[in-house]
Amino acid sequence: VRTVVTTVDNSGKDNIVLVPIKAQAGYLVGAQQEEYIESLPAFWIPGLGHGSFRAFEVSGYSMLADRTGFFPGDIVVGEYVEKIEDIRDGFVYILVNNAQEVDNIVLKRCLNYLDKGGVIICKSDNKDPQYPTFPLQVENIKEVWKFKIKLTRQSPEPSGLYERINALERDMVLMKEQLKKSLPNN
């Protein structure tokens, strides 16, 4: 895993640099160049604490399961992981890599198999067969970012509880109307 280039705000805090989809193709090479990183949008989110953070725009549906998870266009913020050995099974990571078989930036749920073959197993939350599990060789992984938060434009769909409450409310309104009609003054 390589050292990352960061930018800082006026008070000396690390900015969160955003890598939008349009910039992801050049990120693998550009990430080591200060000018490239400074050309990307940067922002700050209160409450993240200390550390180096980077944001990436999500593309595709591989991490979308049952209408929950990560939607295309979501922004995921990850904290820099200095040692690849620190990848923990079952957590979501953003992996910057130079493997030929997959995108250079992938958002996946990972399994650490470094001691059993020198690979990180990358799993999609979407169970559709078009999003298969795949291994990433350790030598192909250039940056690791542990998922911390997401910014999304999607509002969660109502749960079954809301549907039941809405049905009860509708029934009450209908009963109220029927009761009004049955009273002698109406």
Model-predicted segments: where are they?
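Short, intrinsically disordered/low-complexity patches at protein termini
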Residues: E101, V144-K146, E157
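Glycine- and charge-enriched low-complexity intrinsically disordered segments
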Residues: L107-R153
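Detector for Asparagine
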Residues: N10, N15, N97-N98, N104, ...
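Short, surface-exposed, charged/polar-biased interaction segments
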Residues: S39, E79, I94, Y131, ...
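Short, positionally conserved secondary-structure boundary motifs
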Residues: V1-P72, L151-N186
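Feature for secretory/organellar precursors and membrane-associated catalytic proteins
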Residues: L28-E34, W44-K123
